[in-house]
Amino acid sequence: MGQSTDTLGRTSMAQFVYGKNVVKQMLMDNSKVKQIYMSVDDRDVERLARKQRVQLKRVDKKTLTQMTKTDRHQGVVAEVDPYRLYSVDEILQGVSENGKGLIIMLDELEDPHNLGAILRTADAIGATGVIFKKTNAVGLTATVAKVSAGAIDTVKCASVTNLSRTLEDLQKKGWWAVGTDMDGQDYRSVKYDFNTVLIIGNEGKGISRLLREKCDFVVSLPMRGKIESLNAAVSAGILMYSIYNMRFPL
């Protein structure tokens, strides 16, 4: 990506988070906020920016919309250092010795709201990390950051070229693959008392044939109502908390 500057003096490599609460949290956490852009008055943001010695610049609403590619910025945008990505090996360093790691593998997930929500739940249950593809999938964006409510900075994420090969490598290290599909066995029939790679598929296509063939288990969520399926983030959230409940019962 090029380094040309725009009228605000930013380079094309600039990355943003937006929304009053998200920006406030980043400032309170002393995250690496480079600059704040505002089209509204917010005393808390202004106070925190002064405290952290972060430059604040007044711009109009249209400029913020152009910067973030959305009109849901609430008049407050922070320019931040690029979101950190980890290697798979770095993610594995966080696995405890009791054999109860949980990695969420996302197969060409496209909706940033789904990714953000999955990161938020992954943080809540203490997941080991999240892995997604470098291409044909959503990455770490401003929308993902906002929806994640800060989890984008706390959950270790890896972006890989080949999910199938990555899964094979994990299985060689003792991880078990649990795929998701409407035709799978009831998710409650699996104990999850092993290092688990939980695979969540694309919003429309589900998980790919290659990944499904490599799965040790394929599970589904029972649907007793009239709706046939659940949103990817909702399904992932139910499964993540179910695994947590099985591993850490009261």
Language-model features: where?
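RNA substrate-binding interface of SAM-dependent RNA methyltransferases
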Residues: 28, 38, 54, 93-185
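Structured adenosyl-cofactor binding patch, chiefly the S-adenosyl-L-methionine
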Residues: 24, 29-30, 124, 146-149, ...
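Active-site/ligand-binding-proximal alpha/beta "capping" segment
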Residues: 178-227, 231
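Active-site helix-initiating loop/hinge in glycosyltransferases
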Residues: 19, 107, 114, 229-231
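Short basic, glycine-rich beta-strand/loop surfaces that mediate nucleic-acid
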Residues: 67-82, 148-152, 193-201
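N-terminal positively charged helical leader segments and presequences
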Residues: 1-93
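Short, acidic/turn-prone active-site loops that include or flank metal/cofactor-
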Residues: 41, 61-64, 135-137, 203-205, ...
